Amino acid sequence: MAAAKAEMQLMSPLQISDPFGSFPHSPTMDNYPKLEEMMLSNGAPQFLGAAGAPEGSSGSSSGSSGGGGGGGGGSSSSNSNSSSAFNPQGEASEQPYEHLTAESFPDISLNNEKVLVETSYPSQTTRLPPITYTGRFSLEPAPNSGNTLWPEPLFSLVSGLVSMTNPPATSSSASSPAASSSASQSPPLSCAVQSNDSSPIYSAAPTFPTPNTDIFPEPQGQAFPGSAGPALQYPPPAYPGAKGGFQVPMIPDYLFPQQQGDLGLGTPDQKPFQGLESRTQQPSLTPLSTIKAFATQSGSQDLKALNSTYQSQLIKPSRMRKYPNRPSKTPPHERPYACPVESCDRRFSRSDELTRHIRIHTGQKPQCRISMRNFSRSDHLTTHIRTHTGEKPFACDICGRKFARSDERKRHTKIHLRQKDKKADKSAASAATSSLPSYPSPVATSYPSPATTSYPSPATTSYPSPVPTSYSSPGSSTYPSPVHNGFPSPSVATTYSSVPPAFPTQVSSFPSSAVTNSFSASTGLSDMTTTFSPRTIEIC
């Protein structure tokens, strides 16, 4: 413990290294060989001198000790191994320190073995900016420190740096007795840091496997307070929360460029329609359930080609309407679905109509994954898929024939309607032909029959029979002399001769009334016979 107190008194502002210089993967590790070279060039002769040098002489010198951020350096006065504190190569040798254990502070002190330290920079003479800090610190082993890479005292050191107030920044020579008074009895750390470098302490994150935010419970939401001069400032979200200051390499953002489009994280100059395009960018492909037979044939290369094709498609410039001011048939309040493109004022009453219209702007066409055909409408793709699957959901109600498309069934139904109309025309024609023979029969049969049958018979039968019989019988037998010699002969001749001319005139003038003519003729003959030949009736 006395050796640790002596080392704290020997430190000067130009010889104190970065408190975080020994941290693994720290940015200050790149400058550590320069610091060690400076320390060896300035303070090595004092540590390589006589073994029994007094403690006061080493305190007045400006040599450096081996305790950078850890503070556990080599003693130069009271033990026999003080002459071997630094070997000729400039590396610190191992010395027994009972108050520091290897479990709690293994790789921080310069007395331990350094793997990353190289002293092959003789030409570089640039010095680090001077860092001055005052205060006291204590390193005690943590009881439950299972992680040897990040012991608990170091995190208490970081917590003390963040939660400090504004103490006056003085030189270390003025406060060195206070720092060495009770180094092992005061666990808390109060330290002021002043530097001309405005870069943060941690510019890169340590790559430990499972980062835990409980390691830094206090620094969240705090910043380094400013002190006199250009103080070291830090952004408000401290270690776990800040993205630029404390980057934990868990899942880099550059591995997920496509998720930014899905979340709408685009540039401000993009159109509002870009988000909608990214939402509907995936092509409308054939459902996998309908192409089970083709699943083994179509590999992932086709899908990758499709995705790359549609990812490379850009929004086409929107077409202006031919008549933008022409009113639509449907009022606007009944068309709630408006096109999201800025220069397009189309509105639709149905969402599927809007989706179909958006494909005009995006150029997206649903594609069949079996035949790789593109279609302008998704319903056309659905109909096309049925040609591969053999599905025919539309059946004819008359004959039961099935079709894959509804318009095919409608076209087929028209065939049945035409056949039905033809059958109706044929049945009407057959009914008309069956009613025609019953209607014209009275005209063609009943009317000509009296003219041909009943009319000639009285003229040939009833008329000649009384004339020759009644005339010849009295003339030849009964009245031979009066017929040729008396008065009845001229009257009979004149009367009989006048009857035939009157009868043809009646027949010619009244051809339709054949019955009446025959009756009148018979009546005239009967009167003539009864008048001129009374015996005719008896003979007949």
Curated annotation (Swiss-Prot):
Keywords: Activator, Biological rhythms, Cytoplasm, DNA-binding, Isopeptide bond, Metal-binding, Nucleus, Repeat, Transcription, Transcription regulation, Ubl conjugation, Zinc, Zinc-finger. Residues 411-421 have a biased composition (Basic residues). SUPFAM superfamilies: beta-beta-alpha zinc fingers (SSF57667). Residues 1-105, 162-240, 317-337, 407-482 are annotated as: Disordered. Coiled coil: none annotated. It is found in: Nucleus; Cytoplasm. One of its GO terms (cellular component) is nucleoplasm. One of its GO terms (molecular function) is DNA-binding transcription factor activity, RNA polymerase II-specific. Gene3D superfamilies: Classic Zinc Finger (3.30.160.60). Binds to DNA motifs with the sequence 5'-GCG(T/G)GGGCG-3' via its C2H2-type zinc fingers. The first, most N-terminal zinc finger binds to the 3'-GCG motif, the middle zinc finger interacts with the central TGG motif, and the C-terminal zinc finger binds to the 5'-GCG motif. Binds double-stranded target DNA, irrespective of the cytosine methylation status. Has reduced affinity for target DNA where the cytosines have been oxidized to 5-hydroxymethylcytosine. Does not bind target DNA where the cytosines have been oxidized to 5-formylcytosine or 5-carboxylcytosine. Interacts with SNAI1 and SP1 upon 12-O-tetradecanoylphorbol-13-acetate (TPA) induction. Belongs to the EGR C2H2-type zinc-finger protein family. This is Early growth response protein 1.
